[in-house]
């Protein structure tokens, strides 16, 4: 699936902040159409899968915070829900 403008901004922010070995961003908005917080234009619900050396030695909570910090204002402006899978290489 091709990412829209919000997904592309997320990808750029995560690549810049975390230098991931693997990054996958899945727009799950269609699965939430009609739910509270769903934007009719889409790009409101995402799942990000990130494998980054930056996560080595970090707890799950720390990893999620790192992802949230990297995405910054996108989380409040456009992204209603974010599911995160964050791993260090080899996990």
Locate predicted features.
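A generic structural signal for short beta-strands and their flanking turns/coil linkers
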Residues: 19-21, 42-46, 78-82
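N-terminal first-folded block
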Residues: 2-39
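A short interface-forming secondary-structure element
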Residues: 50-60
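C-terminal structural segments of small proteins and small subunits
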Residues: 58-91
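A short, structured beta-strand/loop element
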Residues: 34-52
């Amino acid at each position: 699936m091709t990412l829209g403008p919000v997904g592309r901004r997320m990808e750029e922010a995560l690549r810049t902040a975390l230098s991931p070995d693997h990054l996958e961003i899945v727009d799950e908005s269609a699965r939430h159409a009609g739910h509270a917080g769903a934007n009719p234009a889409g790009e409101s619900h995402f799942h990000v899968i990130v494998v980054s050396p930056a996560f080595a030695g970090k707890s799950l909570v720390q990893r999620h915070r790192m992802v949230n910090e990297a995405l910054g204002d996108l989380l409040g402006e456009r992204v209603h829900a974010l599911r995160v899978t964050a791993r260090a290489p080899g996990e």
